[in-house]
Amino acid sequence: MSPLVEYFSPFMGFYADAQATAPETTLIDGPSMPEPYRSLLVTNGDMTPTLEKFHHCQLHLKVLGRVHAGEEYRRQVLLLDPSQRPVEFGAIRIHLSALLPAVQKLVLAGQRPLGGVLIENSVPHRSQPRAYFSVIGDDLINRALGVSKPCVLYGRCNTLITKDGIPIAEVVEILPP
């Protein structure tokens, strides 16, 4: 599998499960991404605290779909502000074996975004953004983000890794307009 295909695999997995075609993405250089997306996405920080700081509130998780197979846990999610407004649509593949059992349990409960769970439980980790992209939202993405008509959306493919370089999760993150 090519690195690019691997970066998007958490996202593409849900389309494959639904036997649907994923929208075409266009890779872009981080510096060419327009603001405020560049400040939010082109960073080595976790999205959860970055978005919480930007929106001045704690975000909560809405799980739209999940697949748990052994040590791999995939979920399609929204991060919502307190008024239930979506601030991120994402797909994530979590490697449960990289986490302690108590943290695994919190992740599987699906109450908090992964970044929040890692920070709140003092799990040392870092982000490694792999790709930045634009996409014209399809029905699935637009419905999830509350977008009424197709428009250009921006996102990133990111890997969360332990301090020892072991992957915790691969994430595809898309922000609303």
Residue ranges and their predicted role:
Residues 1-177:
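Composition-driven recognition of glycine/serine/threonine/acidic- and proline-rich low-complexity segments
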